[in-house]
A protein has these predicted regions:
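Loop/helix patches that line or flank the sugar-binding groove of alpha-linked glycan CAZymes
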Residues: 1-136
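Generic detection of short hydrophobic beta-strand segments and adjacent strand-loop junctions
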Residues: 54, 128, 154-156, 162-164, ...
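Short aromatic-acidic-glycine turn motif
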Residues: 134-148
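Short, solvent-exposed loop/edge segments of extracellular or virion-exposed proteins
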Residues: 183-195
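Short, polar loop/linker segments at the starts of domains and inter-domain junctions
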Residues: 1-8, 146-160
Length: 196
């Protein structure tokens, strides 16, 4: 309740990211993608329409969040490693990565490549030491899902860490030797890498 609008939206995007980028079948409540609120009423079954009605104007007010969820759905549909439903498949292809407090990070593999997924629930950026050195295509970071026409990349140098933005999810794809991906400008490659 004390967060400003930008922080509340970042938290909502992170929560949506956890749902859509986790294994299994995702499900959200109607309006979650546009920060539906019931005015703080945690038990609104008998509160009436003034509390329970869907405020469709919020789809415009929070269009960035709506677009982000659409991007997550497209990303999930494109990457089989994010849609596994069998424990055996998940166990065989998902590896947890070393990460900071308040961070969950894992690597998932499928026939299309190797992906790194990071959820940073901290109010500050966090260094993720478990991300191996190499070049990565950035599929999502800092509240943005990148499309095919907006390709980004980042290089993590040996001895450095990837820095995940505060209150955000990151999806990286290990770049193949054949990938030609523009590197984000302004990145000091000798230190910790941050996208955004």
């Amino acid at each position: 309740p004390t967060d400003d609008e930008a922080t509340a939206e970042a938290r909502a995007k992170l929560a949506d990211s956890v749902v859509y980028l986790s294994e299994g079948i995702p499900a959200i409540q109607l309006g979650q993608e546009f920060l539906r609120t019931k005015g703080g009423n945690g038990n609104s079954y008998n509160a009436g329409d003034e509390v329970n009605a869907i405020d469709w104007d919020r789809t415009t007010q929070y269009s960035g969040s709506v677009d982000y969820v659409k991007g997550l759905i497209k990303l999930r549909n494109r990457i089989a490693a994010l849609r596994q439903t069998s424990y055996n498949d998940i166990n065989a292809s998902v590896t947890m990565l070393k990460s900071a407090n308040g961070v969950v990070a894992y690597q998932a593999k499928d026939s299309s490549g190797t992906y790194v997924v990071i959820f940073n629930a901290n109010n500050d950026a966090a260094a993720i030491d478990g991300v191996e050195a190499g070049k990565y295509e950035v599929l999502a970071a800092n509240g943005t899902v990148y499309g095919d026409d907006d390709v980004k990349s980042v290089t993590v140098r040996k001895g450095s860490a990837y820095t995940a933005g505060a209150l955000s999810a990151t999806v990286l794809k290990v770049a193949s030797a054949d990938d030609v991906v523009p590197v984000i400008s302004g990145v000091n490659e000798s230190t910790t890498i941050t996208v955004g």
